[in-house]
């Protein structure tokens, strides 16, 4: 039954694609730039809340110093937008307010006694729901903190230090970059789930918003996409023409952006495994890309930088993931259709809802949704 339904949906999707045939492919368009008087070495954001580093000091997009701290190596935004985690060499991670200048909220000091050496933090990240904050250190540990008091909740001992971390949106998995391996940990049980060998040293890891995929960049100029259901490598992009960094998933999961050689932005279409768009820059100095959705109106943007600019790209022109949209719409309609109607007897229900009628109704809904999607797209164009 499932296979038949999937094929029916594919037919309907083909119908949509036919209607769109001949229309121009969607593209990112530069929307707005914020010029800085200072050179941008790194940045982070949560939606439109953006901070950047310049010569070890953190600033807002308006070149306003967030604190007087110097020698900052790395910053990570709390998804709430209210604070940032700040990493300095040989210093405890500190949490600073984004709203109040120089306001330190927490400091994650090591309080354990009897350690042979003081652990140094190497990587850090927040969970997408802002409830958890994790760091990796030089002892090979991954430390889990709550975000109310920033107290350690668990110490996960690995075989070697992790240099990049990602926490899945469903709080099921931690992905860590450990040499030539991606090590997956079960976030709930704190147990190792899987070690995935890679052909070269792993640079960065990033989960898709729905946690179904994991993007991995390695220092052999590859972008690898991994399915989190079975941890199989489902796509490898090894001909993008340079060293790849800063992978970021589009909110719908259909596209991934990467930076090539700290200069050009590449948008990869995961649906058909091709480059959707290249955004060449005039000079080296692009430090990252980050897709995000404006939660107020569901518009999608890509954030990047130039040496002296923060750049917002309008990503709403990218073609939607019609298969995923159709699946959700058809499933929602079917969930309503299979409900017993008011006054309907069990006998009547059994006649109305059976294997044959269910499949037929799925086909009708798939065609209906495909027609609606095609109509919406044509009206937009």
Which role fits each region the language model picked out?
Residues 26-40, 61-64:
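A short helix->beta-strand "capping" segment at the edge of beta-propeller domains
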Residues 34-39, 66-71, 109-121, 156-162, ...:
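WD40/WD-repeat beta-propeller blade N-cap
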Residues 41-43, 50, 75, 124, ...:
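Hydrophobic core register within WD40 beta-propeller blades
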Residues 45, 79-80, 128-129, 169-170, ...:
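Residue-level detector of Asp-centered blade-edge/turn motifs that repeat once per structural unit
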Residues 49-50, 84, 133, 174, ...:
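Hydrophobic beta-strand positions that form the internal "hydrophobic ladder"
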Residues 56, 91, 139-140, 180-182, ...:
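Short coil/turn segments within WD40 beta-propeller repeats
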Residues 59-61, 93-96, 142-145, 185, ...:
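WD40-repeat beta-propellers
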Residues 62-64, 98-101, 147-150, 187-190, ...:
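Short loop/turn segments that connect beta-strands within beta-propeller blades
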């Amino acid at each position: 039954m499932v296979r038949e339904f999937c094929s029916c949906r594919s037919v309907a999707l083909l119908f949509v694609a036919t209607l769109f045939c001949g229309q121009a492919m969607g593209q990112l368009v530069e929307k707005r730039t914020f010029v800085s008087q200072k050179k941008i070495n790194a940045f982070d954001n949560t939606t439109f809340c953006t901070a950047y580093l310049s010569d070890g000091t953190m600033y807002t997009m308006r070149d306003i110093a967030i604190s007087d701290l110097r020698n900052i190596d790395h910053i990570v935004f709390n998804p709430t937008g209210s604070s940032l985690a700040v990493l300095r060499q040989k210093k405890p991670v500190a949490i600073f307010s984004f709203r109040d200048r120089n306001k330190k909220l927490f400091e994650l000091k090591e309080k354990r006694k009897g350690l042979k050496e003081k652990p140094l933090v190497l990587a850090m990240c927040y969970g997408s729901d802002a409830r958890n904050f994790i760091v990796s250190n030089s002892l090979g540990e991954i430390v889990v903190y709550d975000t109310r008091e920033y107290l350690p909740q668990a110490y996960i001992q690995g075989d070697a230090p992790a240099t990049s971390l990602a926490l899945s949106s469903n709080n099921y998995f931690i992905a860590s970059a450990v040499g030539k391996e991606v090590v997956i940990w079960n976030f709930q049980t704190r147990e190792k789930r899987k070690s995935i060998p890679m052909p070269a040293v792993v640079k960065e890891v990033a989960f898709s918003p729905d946690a179904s995929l994991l993007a991995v960049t390695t220092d052999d100029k590859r972008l690898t996409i991994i399915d989190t259901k079975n941890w199989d490598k489902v796509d490898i992009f090894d001909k993008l023409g340079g060293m790849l960094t800063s992978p970021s998933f589009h909110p719908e999961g259909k596209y991934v952006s990467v930076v090539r050689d700290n200069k050009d932005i590449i948008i990869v279409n995961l649906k058909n495994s091709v480059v959707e768009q290249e955004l060449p820059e005039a000079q080296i100095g692009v430090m990252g890309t980050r897709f995000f959705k404006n939660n107020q109106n569901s518009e999608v943007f890509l954030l990047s930088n130039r040496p002296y600019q923060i750049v917002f790209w309008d990503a709403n022109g990218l073609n939607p993931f019609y298969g995923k949209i159709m699946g959700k719409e058809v499933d929602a309609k079917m969930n309503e259709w299979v409900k017993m109607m008011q006054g309907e007897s069990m006998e009547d229900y059994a006649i109305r809802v059976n294997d044959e009628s269910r499949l037929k109704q799925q086909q009708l809904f798939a065609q209906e949704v495909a027609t609606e999607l095609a109509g919406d797209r044509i009206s937009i164009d």
